[in-house]
Each structure stands twice: as C-alpha cells, then as structure tokens.
Regions:
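Carbohydrate transferase catalytic cores enriched for Leloir-type hexosyltransferases
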Residues: 1-345
Length: 345
C-alpha cells in the first residue's frame, strides 16, 4: 500500500506543490492502486471536496505537525511519499520517496526560516530510498548543496500542466502582457514594470501572487499609470483565456525549480519571454525567448520583436509543440513506475 502524506494541503491554500500532489492522488485513484492519503486540517483549494481524501486527526498545531515523523497506518504499507519533506516513524520498514521541487530557500535565504527549512529538507532527502527531482537543474542543485545525496537513487520526473488549449487564430493578440505568480525579489517583477515604461501602448495583467504591495503600487503608478490590472485568483479556464489573448508571458525569474507558467503559456499558444537561467532554459527547449543577463531594456526589445507576425507565429508553434512533452498523467505514471523501481519490482 502507498501512503501519501498530505501535509502540503495544510501548509498551502493553493500553489504548485499542492497541484502536483493533487494530480498524483487523482491518478493513483484512477489506476485503482491501494493507497491512503493522510490529510490534516486544511483550507486548500485542491484538497477539499474530493472523494480520495481520508482525514487523519491531529491534536498538534500544523506549525508543529509539519516537523513530526508520521505514524504509519497499516501493516502492508510499502511506500511512504511525503508531500513536504517529512519522514515516517522510525519503525517503518518500507521504502521512502521524497520529491524535491527546488532550492529557493537555499538560493535566497531568509534567515532562521530558511535554515530550518534546509535542515528538514536535508534530513528528508538523506532519509529517503528514492528521490524524485522535478528538473535536471533541481537535481544538480541537490547534488551541489547536499553532496551526500549523490548516492541515493534519483530520477527526474517533470511536472505537468492543466488542460490548457490554444485558440484557432494563432498570432492574434490584445495589447497586453501577462505576469503570473509570486513577485518577490528574484522574480524580477519590478524589472517587468520598468520594461513596459519603454512601450507606451502595452498593458500589464498580473495574475496571482497576492495583492500589490505599497511599493509595487508606487512603482506601477509612477512608471505605467493606468496600464496595469490585477486578476487575483482566477480559474484555469480564465487563465487559459488570458494566455490565449496575450502578446506574451513575461517570466523574468532568476531561479525556478520548474516554471509551470512557462508551459501553461506555451500550451495556450502564448509566446514566452524569460530569463535564461535555472530550469526555465531546460524545460523551454528553445521555444521561449530566453534572455541572458536579463534587464528591462532586453525585455522591452523582446516584447517588440513579437509584434513581427512571422516571428510570433514561429514561437507560438514551437511552444505548442514543446508543451506536448509535459502532462500530469505522464508525471504520475512515471512516479508509480519509480515506486516499483525502488521496491525492486
């Protein structure tokens, strides 16, 4: 039996790791595999209201529960897979799998919070029988930052994306670019704003990442007043439509473990402008406009280049083709195969 420790659904209301484990659980259920999903008190958008959830009651606050070893239910459990760097109780005799998503906390440390995160991640990795990394870049980061992990069986299994579709009239667009996700420092959101100051007929649509901060509003109102909007939390269908009609996705992040918006945009027929760094280069396979030493002028130049119909069509077609390499079913199927490899089957 497989145990999926669903602690991530209590740590996130939404987010990429939640989606990952939601899709994995959905596939396991569809494949009629015997499993148990341990779910703690949560308000997660993906976990609630789905038939495959089995609740596990705890009296501990989630801030303590997240660091605790997990009691194992059932004598026939042979695979334990935590959604966020936890280990089972020491008496567990089966195989332990850990998925490593990124090393953002190590690359951009935030004091004691990042130190605690790294200790837990390191312990989970070194206590595992098999490691799944969501990109080759993440695997290389793991081997560099935790050298002892080199001896642990490791596979790269890429993330998938949702059911995004391109529209029939490829190449047509409305005069806006889209920025998706978190906007903290290394995401280079301010650079995106500065780039649009150089192009006075293009709007900026921001999706997710929480409301604008006071500093962001000040910069937006100074550099591109009246040319920005925040879509907030929207459905996948609404996001798909925003991608379809956008001139481009701007994704200037300096570091990613994968970069799901890149593939979402490509699958939707939306060209991608991104920093030539970390995993984005790996997953885009030359279908994105990748920028070395990214800056506002280079972003602005890339946006302008996509006004050329032939060049835009080329990038859209390359992106759609590249996106076919990534699906949640493929991710989940490869994960179950890796379970069997670690079992020795």
């Amino acid at each position: 039996m497989i145990i999926i420790d669903g602690i991530i659904f209590s740590l996130q209301k939404s987010g990429g790791i939640s989606v990952y484990f939601y899709e994995l659980l959905k596939y396991i259920q569809k494949a009629n595999k015997e499993y148990l999903h341990l779910l703690y008190n949560n308000q997660n958008a993906y976990a609630n209201g789905n038939g495959f959830i089995i609740n596990s009651k705890t009296r501990l606050h989630i801030s303590i529960e997240r660091f605790r070893r997990v009691p194992i239910i059932g004598d026939e459990t042979d695979i334990f897979h935590s959604s966020y760097y936890r280990l089972p109780e020491r008496s567990f005799s089966g195989k332990i799998i850990t998925t490593v998503h990124d090393f953002t906390e190590e690359m951009y440390p935030r004091g004691i919070v990042s130190k605690i995160h790294h200790i837990q991640k390191r312990n989970a990795i070194l206590g595992s029988d098999g490691i799944i990394c969501i990109s080759k870049n993440t695997m290389m980061d793991m081997h560099r930052l935790i050298p002892e992990s080199i001896d642990i069986p490791t596979t790269v299994i890429y993330n998938g994306v949702g059911d995004f579709k391109s529209k029939e009239c490829l190449g047509e667009y409305e005069p806006y670019v889209i920025f998706v996700g978190a906007r903290n420092g290394y995401k280079n959101f301010n650079m995106c704003i500065s780039a649009l100051k150089k192009i006075n007929d293009i709007r900026l649509v921001v999706v997710g990442g929480g409301g604008f901060t006071d500093n962001e509003l000040k910069l937006l109102n100074t550099l591109i007043p009246g040319r920005y909007s925040h879509a907030g939390f929207i459905t996948e269908i609404e996001l798909n439509k925003l991608y379809q009609n956008s001139l481009a996705l701007i994704y200037p992040s300096s570091y990613e473990g994968f970069g799901i918006p890149v593939i979402e945009a490509m699958k939707s027929g939306c060209p991608v402008i991104a920093s030539n760094s970390s995993s984005v280069q790996e997953i885009s396979n030359n279908a994105a406009l990748l920028i070395d030493s990214i800056c506002d002028k280079k972003i602005a130049d890339a946006i302008q280049s996509l006004r050329n119909p032939a060049f835009r069509q080329e990038k859209i077609k390359l992106g759609i083709m590249n996106a076919t390499n990534y699906s949640w079913d493929k991710m989940a199927n490869e994960t179950l195969s890796f379970y069997n490899t670690i079992r020795g089957l």
